[in-house]
Amino acid sequence: MTTPVSLSQVEKKTIESILTNKKEEGKLITKVTILNEKKKKLEIKTLILSSNRIFLFTDSKGKLSAEHHYLEITEIASQSENDVTIKFKNQNVMKMNLDASEVLKTLYGTLMSTFPGIKIGKTIIFNITPASRIPSIFQATSFKDIQGCGSFNLTYRSVCDHLGVQPLSSILWDIENLYPFNQVREFNLAEIYQYSFTDLKAILLSLSYNTYFQSFQSNGKLSNEDLNLLAEVFKENSSLQQLTITNSQASKEPIITLLQNVAENKALHLSHINLNNNSLENKGILTLGSSIQTFSNGLTYLNIENTSCSGKGLEAMFGCLTANNVVCGSMTHLNISNNKLESYGTNGLCKFLSKATALQQLLMSNTSPVYSFLKTSSSSIQTLDFSGNKSTTTKESVIDILSFFKQMSHLQTVNLSRIQTTPDDLKLLFSPATSLLKCSSVDLSENDLGDGGIIKLCEIMYPNSNLHHLSIDGNFKTKSKLRARAIEALINLIDDNTSIESLSLASGSGKYQLKGDLMPLLLSLLKNQSLVKLDISGNGVGDSGALAVSKILWKNQTLKSLKCDGNDFSYTALKMIKCSIRRNEKSLTILQLPLSDISTILKNDSNGSSHEKILKTIQDIQTSIVINYPNNIHPIDTSSGGLTPTKQPSIGSLAGVIKKPPIGPPSTPTKSSNPGFQTLPKRPTRGPLYPGRATGGAVTLTDKAQINASTIELPPLVSRSIDLLMEQGISSVGIFRTCASATALKKIKTRFEAGEDIDLKAENVDVDTVAGVLKSYFRELPNPIFPENLHEYFFQAMRQSSNEEIIQSLKDIIDQLSPLECKMIKKLFHLLHLISLEKDVNMMSPENIAICWAPTFFRSFASELLPINSFMIVNYFDIFDPENKPISSDNSGDADTDSTQSTCTTNNNNLVATSLSSPISPSTTPTKSIDNVLHTTVEVSRSPNHERAHTVGPMTSKRPISNNNGVSSNTPPLPNNVTPHHNTMPSRPSASPIKRPPSMGGSLSNFAGIPLSNHSSSGQLNNNNSNNNTTSNSSNSSSGKSSSNPSPIPTPPDSPSMSYIGDGKSTLRSKRFSRVNRVSYSPVLPRAWTNESRTVSSLFQDDLDSNSDSSGPSL
């Protein structure tokens, strides 16, 4: 007791007895003078201020005269230093003469320490005059009595004392021991065990007068009376920021009252509201919207899923949200699922989305939107749940919502399950016109795609290097003849698209089981090094499937999470899984027990003899997984404050520190700022071979100028591959379009990724395989060479009026790349340029090369990018290497041609005429004597820089000509009046014509100075009408020489054979080519090529009908 007061023994004994019975502790005791209203006289009494109540005792015997709880006080007034008046809710008034300053300080300090959330000036009024006394009373008050959890235990005890209720010991223990341990500020009614209505009333009233908790959650049944009590909480409380009331099963009226109190309480700042599964109807939704419209601090989370509201109610709510600019700029999560949008709600949603600049998650499943009204969206949306939204009318189609998806430029996760889409609709949805191809998580469950649809889906998803999770549950409704191809397409997809980390193939709600059809996919995971999470629940694969799973778990070190319930596993299957996990210390870390299968096993064991064995096996599986955790923990840098090497993380946090084994050389581990609180890890970047894009900021031109290009080393895979292709692959027919051996390609890639520097030439690796490895490298880069943010700059560059301006604009774009990227693409485009110059031989014009490489460079299949890529290939030297651009000569308009050049041209004409006029059978080739004449008669001027064919640039070698029958011979460059017949390979049409620069005109006289080659290939020449006579006369003088040696030169085994048709046209017979969709690595075609697997839609093939009248290469 702070103030000593002399009391008689009788008074002291009586007061201590009363305080002990009431479990009160006195804070202040003093003598006061009180006016007795009945007796109209002053009486001296003893005043005691305890922790919860005010006591008055008589001065003589210590008899209790009056007591009042602090929560009964309505006003405390003091007009001078010697008087205090206290008013109570029951209209009682206590007027006292005493030292007012000490009493007021004790009253205020006790109130604020016991009820930190009580509103001074509203709940209790302090009326103190003069005002100069207020600072000395309030500011000098100490709050040392405030305990852990904001003194919530004191508040709860005091409220229980006020209501006459015994406090729940479980709540007091939790408040004193659990909540302070990890700073939990979420009050969840589900954590309170067995409470009555009065207990709930005491708890909620305590929340009203305390400021510790910031979140209130209730997920269960609440009566109307309970909700009315909760409404009073939100009328008084000023600290709660999150409100969650779900599945209350109450009427809408008490919830409406609660929302009205929220709007009236200006001290309350809710940022999170979750009212799902409550019957709010339109009236409740409108009240909610009106309340949110009054918010001044914004709202980040709103969930009104399944609240029985119609389109008009939603339209009214969206109107209120749109009217509050603060809410539009702060809301990040909106869930309106299982409500009917209809036309009114769809319009309101679009208006809100047009202003919702911060919205990241939009969940609108089963809302029946009108497709044609979905015109506006938000570019900030990252997660979209559009599941269950079928078209409302037969006239609506996916085309109506393309603009809705197109505006979501940052979309990462999309759920399109149960929308009954078709494969053709999927092609539209995942076209470059939308942003869905950028999504890392795609859910297409229960769309009844069937086997054919799965094949189409794999083809669509194949180029998506951003895809990490794919869910196709319940799509195998009916088995067809395409089932094997569908499974193989999935295998190829997850094998080739190494970004896919999670795959879900569960049976879905329709229970469409794959059974034995799933076996090839399971066995393919033995060597898979990218998949981290797999779900095959409900497919009924049986013990044979369990055997495949056990082999996977035994060998695979990447797969960390597996769901396999509902597969008819027996006790033997459980034992196999147990043994495989034990034998692989880097096996699973998350395995959901197959409870339904275990239940079936136990039911079938009627005698119960195997129950103990089954239980022991399950325990061994769990123990093995726990033992495997330390082997899957990513090393943590102890300097960053992480776990020490000897400290073992708790089981609850171990799932967040899983790391996949790296592919290739190990990279330096990065520091983790928050270890133990991550989800499944991302696939690591594939070592130094995959540099990706620099993350340290853009490299300025000044920085580039200071970097010596000779100090930048290209990845061995790139440099070795390009060097070999320059030397051996420039004239290879169909280079980059020809299908390479998938096995050989993977072997080469694996060796390079392991850090081995392979001598491709010494090992005699096929050029098609090297081309496939090179293209695969650029396709698998974490970021494309030309990212999406540069695409618009490319389009603007191509709109320039002249070639010079276009070239300069493209050079400016190239300068924005990192030095390593600049060096890589410079060397790669040099190769492509050289290949394009041999288009008459290799049938790869710049347009055809662009079809192969544009999707890889730009990571897009937009046809508008093809002419850009083609232009860069043709104008390589102008864009990438203007210093070494060869000097081309044009003799067609020069009257003073030098005699040597004139002699060369004349000889060329004579030789061409000779070869064209000589009747040679298709089985023969030019004689050796002609080859000698070509080498001895024609003199070609070389540039000093032209030492090797692959370093010459546009002045490359190996340009053959052929006679009318398609037989080729090595010749020097042709004069101006002879034009070659260009490659007739079919190619994708460009969006706009490409202007050929002057150095690449139709006249072949520009190619004077190229070195000769001994390599023979196929080609064709069509002479202009203007030089027919000259050619004919020249042929008479050399016809004898051309036929002196009729013996044919054998064709090398590796060179393609040519089939000749009556009109002299030739077609390729030995090679097959892929289309723009990269079908050379397509997941939808078998790896072993057969006649059954060759289709017009996937191959440029040559199956010609012997009776057909063809004029060129045909499909």
Curated annotation (Swiss-Prot):
Name of this chain's protein: Rho GTPase-activating protein gacW
Compositional bias (Polar residues): 934-943, 959-990
Any GO BP annotation: regulation of phagocytosis
Role noted for this protein: Rho GTPase-activating protein involved in the signal transduction pathway.
Domain of life: Eukaryota
A cellular-component GO term for this protein: lamellipodium
Low complexity: compositionally biased ranges: 898-929, 1013-1046
Gene responsible for this protein: gacW
PANTHER family: LEUCINE-RICH REPEAT, ISOFORM F-RELATED, RHO GTPASE-ACTIVATING PROTEIN GACW
Subcellular compartments: Cytoplasm
Domain Rho-GAP: 699-880
Region (Disordered) location: 661-691, 888-1065, 1092-1115
SMART domains, per the entry: LRR_RI, RhoGAP
Organism annotation: Dictyostelium discoideum
Keyword Cytoplasm in record: yes
Keyword Cytoplasm: yes
Keywords, sorted A to Z: Cytoplasm, GTPase activation
UniProt-listed InterPro entries: CARMIL_PH (IPR041245), Leu-rich_rpt (IPR001611), LRR_dom_sf (IPR032675), PH-like_dom_sf (IPR011993), PP1-Reg/Actin-Interact_Protein (IPR051279), Rho_GTPase_activation_prot (IPR008936), RhoGAP_dom (IPR000198)
